[in-house]
Amino acid sequence: MAWFSRKKEEGAATRVNIAEGLWIKCDSCKEIMYRAEVERAGRICPKCRYPFRISARERLALLADPGSFEEREAGLTSTDPLGFKDARRYRERIRAASQKTGAEDAVICGIARIGGVPAVLCVFEFGFMGGSMGSVVGEKLARSIELAVAKHLPVVIVSASGGARMQEGILSLMQMAKTAAALERLAAEGLPYLSVLTDPTTGGVTASFAMLGDVILAEPRALIGFAGPRVIAETIRQPLPEGFQRSEFLLEHGQIDLIVDRRDLKDTLRRILAFFCEPTPPSE
């Protein structure tokens, strides 16, 4: 028998179970918002306009005309050439990333129409090992650019990457030269390359194809650079300027051409592509 018991107060608030995933926190303003409200806004924070990260498939749905995207090079997968192992085997990491994202590697490539203009479109999947560039990513990009040369099409690459994939060592670094060389052939044919930088675009991706666009666009507040700001600050032992390595800072210093809201990106790409190319009317 309990000698003491807490008297239940009338009208006391009862605990309400809230469905997991119903709310989402903005990484920028730290506000907690109703997830459905954020989804309706195109995965953009209604409070501060910060663009949340989205998957490659979501990005393709935003940019490609409905039903126009034809994926290419979908069967390429890494063979783990170094037999790499850290805390986990590289093969296990690839398998887990594929199960998590539904992608075979960190980039999805194909041909699409963007506002009626045919183009080769490549979109990074940051959820796949941080969008890192290994031999498969470099090969898919190089083949896609070669396809653009063969079909005389412009190229649009949407980057979201932490850089070269360390599990592939020098083979991943070689992809920087491979993609840059492919883009040189594209330029020799007089074909345009539009580079779209999203949060984050860093490391070997920034140091190669991401900054080689004829027109370089970025989403608001995207982190863009080679080494991260913390590493740079510790190396030079000096405070960094406010907003350093964010897209607004790069635009102010002439490193990129445009900052475009996600909801306006497709129309902006369409207008730029139409300047270089004749739009193809949709088939009846």
Feature-to-residue mapping (PLM):
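A structural preference for short, pocket-lining loop segments at secondary-structure junctions
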Residues: 112-123, 140-164
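Cys/His-rich microdomains that often coordinate metals
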Residues: 32-33, 51-52
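Long, charge-rich boundary regions
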Residues: 53-129
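Short cysteine-rich clusters marking metal-coordination/redox-active sites
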Residues: 26-29, 45-48
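Conserved catalytic cores of soluble enzyme domains
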Residues: 159-280
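Conserved mixed alpha/beta catalytic, RNA-binding, or beta-rich assembly cores of soluble enzyme
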Residues: 126, 133-144, 175-176, 182
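Residues immediately within or flanking Cys/His clusters that coordinate Zn2+
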Residues: 23, 42
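N-terminal alpha-helical interaction blocks
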Residues: 1-14
